[in-house]
């Protein structure tokens, strides 16, 4: 079976986006562990960039994935907008849309859209270390806007379905 690195975005002193006491680093860790558990139960070899509240730079995470010779890299994040409750939905970022990573991202987005999230699409970001410096297909998934109440309610109430949707999007692509 393939090796998938599951990256919980941010961590330690890097809270990521925050909203009314909610920290992106906590949401990403909880979701990364849940997604990884589903993948492990499906026979996938999973490597976590973190399993507790520590910080590593995105470049360190990419380097660790490369050293482990992983087959895929999935980074889990929450989005944020300049104004509270301004935007809603999910988005996946890849280095190149016309790639294996783009296919994985489309599958993940489609699954999350089926749970009621607005699908903001798959977009290219060539400046992100976890997408640029990894030697394997890499996807950064933005699971709802942390400063949008509707997305947080969906994130909390459908947490395990979200984890399953992300895992299924990965499994259907590898």
Sequence positions of predicted segments:
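Active-site-proximal helix/loop segments of hydrolytic enzymes
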Residues: 26-174
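Catalytic-core environment of secreted peptidases
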Residues: 1-19, 74
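Glycine- and acidic-residue-enriched helix-capping/strand-helix junction motifs
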Residues: 16-30
